Amino acid sequence: MARTKKVGITGRFGPRYGRKAKRAVKKIEEEMKRKHVCPSCDRPGVKRESRGIWKCRKCGAVFTGGAYLPVTPMGKTAARNIKRIVGGK
């Protein structure tokens, strides 16, 4: 597969689609494909099953999240607010 140091994972597109689009795709896909921390067992083993569905390879927990990341910025905010309300702080 045609990959280089600069284009990395987007080398598969070759000369098509332009530099800006490929940079955006590269940033999203590299972040998406790395291992994420599981919310159940706190170990790095979460991989993307399909769009918005994530699975931990260590404990087998399956949960929903964002399309490209298991925890979205809005999800973090909501969890923080719920924790604050339930915790009484």
UniProtKB/Swiss-Prot annotation:
Keywords on record: Metal-binding, Ribonucleoprotein, Ribosomal protein, RNA-binding, rRNA-binding, Zinc, Zinc-finger
Signal peptide per UniProt: none
Cofactor(s) for this UniProt protein: Zn(2+)
GO biological process terms, semicolon-separated: translation
Annotated GO CC locations: ribonucleoprotein complex; ribosome
Pfam family, one: Ribosomal_L37ae
SUPFAM superfamilies: Zn-binding ribosomal proteins (SSF57829)
Cofactor binding note from Swiss-Prot or TrEMBL: Binds 1 zinc ion per subunit.
Bridged cysteine pairs (disulfide): none
Superkingdom of the organism of origin: Archaea
Record function comment: Binds to the 23S rRNA.
Protein family: Belongs to the eukaryotic ribosomal protein eL43 family. Putative zinc-binding subfamily.
Known partners and oligomeric status: Part of the 50S ribosomal subunit.
Cross-referenced NCBIfam families: eL43_euk_arch, PRK03976.1
Name of the protein in its database record: Large ribosomal subunit protein eL43
Organism placement in taxonomy: Archaea, Methanobacteriati, Methanobacteriota, Methanomada group, Methanobacteria
